[in-house]
């Protein structure tokens, strides 16, 4: 077992002893067990699966952030965390459409392009998780 803390800008979402954590990173989905090697990586939009020490499994949708794995402590600092059934599908569809439309504009600055690419990736991941839950 190890300690997992999932934190957003508004506060702690989860803190407790866990057996395993599975999360989506820039390098793909990874699983973390006790005594995992030291790791600092970017979190990308996707599913966060937590298997608690008592066997209970919790699943969340997360957006962008940073994962810090250090011995018996793991910290996930993320922009947003959602219960899978709390994803606002209509809103995410609207944000995805907006991002797709904006990205067709050839006059976007690099900063604007990066913003809308992140928005598109975030919304698409959340929509995929919401549809998988149904």
UniProtKB/Swiss-Prot annotation:
<keyword id="KW-0406">Ion transport</keyword>
<comment type="subunit">
    <text>F-type ATPases have 2 components, CF(1) - the catalytic core - and CF(0) - the membrane proton channel. CF(1) has five subunits: alpha(3), beta(3), gamma(1), delta(1), epsilon(1). CF(0) has three main subunits: a, b and c.</text>
</comment>
<dbReference type="GO" id="GO:0005886">
    <property type="term" value="C:plasma membrane"/>
</dbReference>
<dbReference type="GO" id="GO:0046933">
    <property type="term" value="F:proton-transporting ATP synthase activity, rotational mechanism"/>
</dbReference>
<keyword id="KW-0139">CF(1)</keyword>
<keyword id="KW-0813">Transport</keyword>
<keyword id="KW-0066">ATP synthesis</keyword>
<protein>
    <recommendedName>
        <fullName>ATP synthase epsilon chain</fullName>
    </recommendedName>
</protein>
<comment type="similarity">
    <text>Belongs to the ATPase epsilon chain family.</text>
</comment>
<keyword id="KW-0997">Cell inner membrane</keyword>
<dbReference type="Pfam" id="PF02823">
    <property type="entry name" value="ATP-synt_DE_N"/>
</dbReference>
<feature type="region of interest" description="Disordered">
    <location>
        <begin position="100"/>
        <end position="134"/>
    </location>
</feature>
<keyword id="KW-1003">Cell membrane</keyword>
<keyword id="KW-0472">Membrane</keyword>
<dbReference type="InterPro" id="IPR020546">
    <property type="entry name" value="ATP_synth_F1_dsu/esu_N"/>
</dbReference>
<dbReference type="GO" id="GO:0005524">
    <property type="term" value="F:ATP binding"/>
</dbReference>
<dbReference type="InterPro" id="IPR001469">
    <property type="entry name" value="ATP_synth_F1_dsu/esu"/>
</dbReference>
<feature type="compositionally biased region" description="Basic and acidic residues">
    <location>
        <begin position="110"/>
        <end position="120"/>
    </location>
</feature>
<dbReference type="InterPro" id="IPR036771">
    <property type="entry name" value="ATPsynth_dsu/esu_N"/>
</dbReference>
<dbReference type="GO" id="GO:0045259">
    <property type="term" value="C:proton-transporting ATP synthase complex"/>
</dbReference>
<keyword id="KW-0375">Hydrogen ion transport</keyword>
<comment type="function">
    <text>Produces ATP from ADP in the presence of a proton gradient across the membrane.</text>
</comment>
